């Protein structure tokens, strides 16, 4: 995982001011890892703001709205 400088652009594209609810954790394979401050769940975004999740060791693209809700509300997938 690459550390700093933090890249907030993908998250800002999607949620604007709500970025304050997240911590930037690092970058890996061109994807930005953000952690929600309350639920402690990760939101993984590419440069265009598309969402990904880890499934069986692979990164799979998923619907942003559903993934954002899961992360923010602490909903199990």
Language model features with spans:
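Acidic, low-complexity, intrinsically disordered interaction modules
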Residues: 19-61
């Amino acid at each position: 995982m690459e550390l700093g400088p933090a890249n907030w652009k993908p998250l800002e594209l999607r949620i604007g001011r709500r970025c304050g609810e997240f911590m930037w954790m690092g970058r890996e394979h061109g994807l930005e890892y953000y952690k929600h401050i309350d639920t402690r769940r990760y939101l993984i975004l590419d440069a265009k703001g598309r969402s990904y999740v880890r499934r069986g060791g692979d990164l799979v693209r998923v619907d942003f709205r559903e993934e954002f809700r899961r992360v923010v509300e602490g909903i199990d997938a």
